[in-house]
Design a protein with these regions (language model features):
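Immediate post-signal peptide segment of exported/extracytoplasmic ligand-binding proteins
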Residues: 1-4, 94-98
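Beta-alpha-beta core module
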Residues: 63-70, 74, 132-183
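Short, surface-exposed acidic/glycine-rich loop or hinge patches that mediate macromolecular interfaces
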Residues: 11, 38, 108, 181-182
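Short, well-ordered beta-strand segments
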Residues: 3-7, 55, 79, 102, ...
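Hydrophobic hinge/microswitch elements
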Residues: 39-52, 57-58, 107-161
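Central regulatory/effector-binding core of bacterial HTH transcription factors
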Residues: 1-63, 129-131
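Secondary-structure junction motif
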Residues: 58, 86-88, 93, 99-121, ...
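A late-sequence structural motif
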Residues: 15-16, 88, 163-205
Length: 209
């Protein structure tokens, strides 16, 4: 009857939770999961206090008492609806800048990696919509000529047309974090192992496509 509290985005939920619950139904049907999104600056405090068992996020500057391993890595692509006027094999920087963009971020303000890369080139994209949720973006994309920069795995899952980015940005890394006080806890270690194995399977499946 153990309940695990995990901080993650809706993007990570969509990748991790379906295969996790397939596994839990077989191995531990009474285990419960509570998913939420903690503020990044509070991750260490929440893990240390036991209010979170795990956090799944990009690389963070955390306390030395917080352990972590990399779960997933995915490259970013420019995604749009199928049939979009710019749905082709390659985009120039000028074509990318001509698009009306959705920017996904849980923060109220701040630039994304694409914007930082464009800024170094003296360029700026047009962000028409800033949203917290990836899932919402797919609905807007399918009904408009807007574009969104998302991980390749997400674009495939939602049948979006994807084009390589015309600017170089680092891939998205997702790490799993836990507090050292739970490092040897049998339940915590078992759940950690399940999520690491699931991430390995997701990675292998993507590489096989």
């Amino acid at each position: 009857n153990k309940t695990f509290r995990i901080s993650m985005t809706d993007l990570t939920e969509a990748v991790v939770l379906p295969p996790l619950f397939q596994r839990l139904r077989r191995l531990a049907p009474n285990v419960k999961i509570e998913s939420m999104l903690a503020k990044r600056r509070e991750t260490t405090k929440e893990l240390a206090a036991g209010r979170l068992d795990f956090a799944m996020d990009a690389p963070l500057n955390t306390d030395p008492q917080v352990r972590h391993v990399k779960l997933l890595e995915d490259r970013y692509v420019c995604a749009m609806r199928r049939g979009h006027p710019l749905a082709k094999d390659k985009l120039s920087v000028e074509e990318y800048l001509s698009l009306s963009h959705i920017h996904i971020s849980s923060r109220r303000s701040g630039l994304g990696m694409v914007d930082l890369a464009l800024g170094k080139m003296g360029q700026q994209r047009k962000i028409a919509l800033r949203s917290q949720h990836y899932m919402m973006a797919t609905q807007v994309i399918q009904q408009t000529d807007m574009a969104v920069t998302v991980p390749e795995r997400f674009a495939r899952r939602h049948d979006l047309y994807q084009v390589p980015l015309p600017v170089d940005i680092p891939p998205l890394e997702t790490h799993i974090y836990w507090h050292e006080s739970t490092d040897q806890d049998p339940a915590n270690r078992w759940m950690r192992e399940q999520m690491i194995e699931i991430a390995q399977q997701v990675t292998a499946a993507q590489q096989a496509d």
